[in-house]
From Swiss-Prot:
Family annotation (Pfam families): HSP33 (PF01430)
Record's keyword terms, sorted: Chaperone, Cytoplasm, Disulfide bond, Redox-active center, Zinc
GO cellular component annotations of the record: cytoplasm
UniProt KW Disulfide bond keyword: yes
Main location: cytoplasm
Organism: Streptococcus sanguinis (strain SK36)
Protein name: 33 kDa chaperonin
Length: 290
């Protein structure tokens, strides 16, 4: 079971979220059949969305779009406050060579572009905010977004580690944010600790990477665990939603599908579930337009 643990320093100056997103990213890889670089890039973006959604309340949905310039294309993920996240990469079969040490490159793979966040509070007026991709590594781009767009100094670490067969071995990350009222000396102390943290990949390889992340973030600083919440890859698509989408097509197009194709098939981009609509389904839509 994947989870996010929310914590706060005992003096109330900082909050930290740590995540185990291994099954989330593994499910995404299985559904989309992504190559190594695509898996890591999509996985990091899924984790980034989980972090942003964890900061929200109510029935809020967070859409993250990584709009890079490379052949990978766009990465689009959607997370909600119930712990669900879904996502896809435009070109999952694109890959680049690993480094000599076996590291999967993401920054050069994503390229330059924009980091777009759409916050939907369910009011019909979603809020859009965009910052440039500063590295394409996703974690650094999220930290820059939070600092620039939300005016909240933040440190972010997230990664996806693959095994020798390029299957997801472990995935997770952390967010540390300064809270109002933090003193300069406290900020400096935490900044130093974050700078001296082991690489996120090393921490994720620990037997208990959640505890390893918390220990690296807080050191000897006392902190409180506020909550532990389940997170998962879960798409909310259904046949009715795609039926409604078909209903928006011109009558002539529906008749062509009925007569020439004997039906229609729509595949959800987010989870690759295929929905089949037979001639009777199409006939129903055609009658509604008569």
């Amino acid at each position: 079971m994947d989870k996010i643990i929310k914590t706060i320093s005992e003096n109330g100056s900082f909050r930290a979220y740590v995540l185990d997103s291994t099954e989330t990213v593994r499910t995404a890889q299985e559904k989309h059949q992504t190559q190594a670089s695509s898996t890591v890039a999509l996985g990091r973006t899924l984790i980034a969305s989980q972090i942003l959604a964890a900061n929200e309340k109510g029935q809020t949905k967070i859409t993250v779009k990584v709009l890079g310039t490379s052949s990978l294309g766009a990465i689009i993920t959607v997370a909600d406050t119930e712990g669900n996240v879904k996502g896809y990469v435009q070109n999952p079969g694109v890959d680049i060579k690993k480094t000599a040490t076996g590291e999967v490159l993401v920054g050069p793979f994503v390229g330059q572009g924009e980091f777009l966040v759409i916050t939907d509070y369910g009011t019909g007026n979603p809020y859009n905010s965009m910052t440039p991709l500063i590295s394409g590594e996703i974690g650094e781009d999220l930290a820059f977004y939070l600092t620039e767009s939300q005016q909240t100094p933040s440190a972010v670490g997230l990664n996806v580690l693959l095994d020798e067969n390029d299957k997801v071995k472990v995935a997770g990350g952390f967010l540390v944010q300064v809270l109002p009222g933090a003193k300069e000396a406290e900020i400096a102390r935490f900044e130093k600790r974050i700078q001296e943290m082991p690489a996120i990949s090393r921490l994720l390889e620990s037997d208990d990477h959640i505890e390893a992340l918390l220990a690296a973030i807080y050191g000897n600083e006392p902190y409180k665990r506020l909550s532990e919440e389940e997170i998962r890859f879960q798409c909310d698509c259904n046949k009715e939603r795609f039926m409604n989408a078909l209903a928006t097509l011109p009558k002539a197009d529906l008749e062509e599908m009925r007569d020439q194709d004997q039906g229609a098939e729509i595949v959800c981009q987010f989870c690759q579930t295929a929905y089949h609509f037979d001639q009777n389904d199409l006939e129903e839509l055609i009658r509604d337009k008569s």
